[in-house]
Every structure is written in structure tokens, then in C-alpha cells.
A protein has these predicted regions:
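Flexible, acidic/Gly-rich N-terminal and inter-domain linker regions that tether
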Residues: 1-49, 53-57, 218-224, 233
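Residue-identity detector for threonine
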Residues: 3, 7, 25, 37, ...
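Conserved Radical SAM active-site core
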Residues: 10-11, 20-23, 27, 42-45, ...
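Short glycine- and Lys/Arg-enriched binding-loop motifs that mark or flank ligand-binding interfaces
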Residues: 30, 36, 87-88, 240
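Short, mixed-charge, low-aromatic patches
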Residues: 30-37, 60, 129-135, 166
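Generic structural signal for well-ordered alpha-helical scaffold segments
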Residues: 33, 76-80, 180
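Short hydrophobic/aromatic-rich motifs at helix boundaries and adjacent loops
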Residues: 47-49, 75-76, 147-148
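Conserved AdoMet/S-adenosylmethionine-binding subsite of the radical SAM
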Residues: 95-241
Length: 241
């Protein structure tokens, strides 16, 4: 039987021989931002490969292993070609690659609005303060809630956002308890998103957006309900959108 540590080692294996100064990228493309308070805006996405988490409802498993090497200069050049003022660094888990910190610095130096979407399991300390962080707090039904790095809450800025992906009423109740325990509604913008479109053959629990909307209304919590806009515009299984 594979131990938890060897499982993580296996997940990180694609990065083992990555040259210093290079990023293992999965895809770079322009689309409509589908989440966060930036939803609806044109955005360039830099999706880095490899993730150490395995959320049961993950909609980007294709980024676990597949990637190509690119220098920071190459990535910067490709982003700038789109002439789009908004860029998001996502994954995978982007903070697994140390070069991402310099990439974000250089993107911000060019005057771009830089978003970072991260699982919340890794230290946010080195992130450039100009970057807008969108951090997950993993709910129990994700299978990854034990990896939440609670110390990151003290590293977030008031302009950063915390996202909860909700797959059940139990997840929602956990979210409300967590918000209250850490006074999050007074500190950050909070996003709650339903798992309503899972990958084929996924065993993830799902809920309808209307269910989550009703729970949110009944709770009185000032969180923002979000539905992944890109999945309403295009096929939920489509890539590069």
C-alpha cells in the first residue's frame, strides 16, 4: 500500500528534474474570467502543471502531469502578446514552483493586474503584495481539508479573497463555522461556489446552485455566491476556455 508521503512524492515527480529557472507550464490562453470578483473580465490564464492535492471534484486533472518547460521570459512574452491587463496564475498548484514568485513580480512590474489562485496549502509569505490572492479553504468533502494552512489567514491582505467550494450541506455548515471561528467575513471577500459540474466518472458529491443560494440566504452570511461563468458559456469539459 502506498503511504501518504510516497503518494505526495509520486504527485510531485514531474517536478523532480525540472531545471532551475524554468516553469513547467500546462497551458497559457485568454478567456473570460469565470470566478472571483473579477468574473466576466477578459483574462490571460497561466496554468502551471502539477498539483500535490487530489480534490475529489477537481476539474483540471489534466494539469497533474502534462506540461512543457518555459523560461520566465518566455511566459512573460506570451502573456504580453495578448495585450490584456488582467492575468491569473493558476494550476495545478502554482506555488509548488519557486520560479512563480519571480514571474508574478515581473508581471506586476509591467503594470498588469495579477491574480493568484492557490489551494491554501502552501506558504503565502513570498507572494508579491501587489498580487491579488484567491485562496481556497478546502471543505471536508474535497478530501483535502487536512492540508489547509491556517497560518496563511494572517498573511492575506484585505483585498484578497477566500473561496469555499461546496459539495454538500455538511460542507456549507463547515464553511459557516470556519467563517465565524476566524471572523473571516469582517476581514476578506468570501466566495462560495457549488460543485455542480464534475468531470466524467467522478464520484464527487454535487449540489445545485439554487440549493447553495438558499442556504446562503438562510445563513445571513455576507459571502458572494459564484458559479463558474466559463462553464455556462462553454462546454463544462472544454479546455483552454
Amino acid at each position: 500500500m502506498m503511504t501518504p508521503s510516497s503518494t505526495v512524492e509520486h504527485r510531485l515527480a514531474p517536478l523532480a528534474n525540472k531545471p532551475v529557472g524554468q516553469l513547467l507550464t500546462h497551458e497559457i490562453y485568454r478567456s473570460i474570467q469565470g470566478e472571483s470578483t473579477f468574473a466576466g473580465l477578459p483574462c490571460v490564464f497561466v496554468r502551471l502543471a502539477v498539483c500535490d492535492a487530489r480534490c475529489v471534484w477537481c476539474d483540471t486533472p489534466h494539469a497533474f502531469n502534462q506540461g512543457s518547460l518555459a523560461s520566465i521570459d518566455d511566459v512573460l512574452s506570451r502573456v504580453l502578446e495578448y495585450r490584456c491587463p488582467l492575468v491569473e496564475i493558476t494550476g495545478g498548484e502554482p506555488l509548488l514552483q519557486q520560479e512563480v514568485f519571480l514571474l508574478m513580480n515581473r508581471l506586476a512590474d509591467r503594470g498588469l493586474t495579477v491574480l493568484l489562485e492557490t489551494s491554501g496549502a502552501h506558504d503565502l509569505g513570498p507572494v508579491d503584495p501587489r498580487v491579488h490572492i484567491i485562496m481556497d479553504l478546502k471543505c471536508p468533502d474535497s478530501g483535502e481539508s487536512a492540508a489547509n494552512r491556517w497560518a496563511n489567514l494572517d498573511l492575506l491582505k484585505p483585498t484578497d479573497q477566500i473561496k469555499f467550494v461546496i459539495a454538500s450541506k455538511a460542507d456549507f455548515d463547515w464553511t459557516i463555522r470556519t467563517i465565524r471561528a476566524y471572523d473571516l467575513d469582517r476581514r476578506f471577500t468570501l466566495l462560495v461556489s457549488p460543485v455542480f459540474s464534475a468531470p466524467p466518472n467522478s464520484k464527487a458529491p454535487m449540489i445545485q446552485p439554487a440549493e447553495l443560494a438558499q442556504w446562503l440566504l438562510e445563513s445571513g452570511m455576507p459571502a458572494r455566491l459564484q458559479v463558474q461563468l466559463h462553464k455556462l458559456i462553454w462546454d463544462p469539459q472544454a479546455r483552454g476556455v
